[in-house]
Amino acid sequence: MQNENPKRVWLYARIPGNDVETLRCIRECAAKAQQDNCNIVGTSTDERPGWLLRPGYREMMRQVKAGKIDCIHIYRMRQISGKEQHLFRFFQQVMQHGVKVVTLEYSLRDRLHEYRLGMKIENYAARHKLP
């Protein structure tokens, strides 16, 4: 049975200093979204390293908070952040709004355990009765 309302997906990529690779990641995320019969409602990229100067990330999170997306496709978690506290805050925010995260390069569950976030996120979800 086909889902009448395809998932609304946002694509995000960030590889500082490498526009070609960033665009390749966006293309692969778009292909995955199309394969999953999702509706791509937005795309953003960031060019800079660090956490503060990331307008693409901020726009994506505005859309999350506004309830405009159901899923975020990213190529790898490091494109969000390599820091545990930033990743935890990211997952808190998307979970509060029921947004699913899909990574293409590897298993998200395995990667969260590598970042020591698996149990933290599961505990947070249980405390707040989130899926």
Cite the ranges covered by each PLM segment:
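Short, structured surface patches at the beginning of a domain
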Residues: 1-131
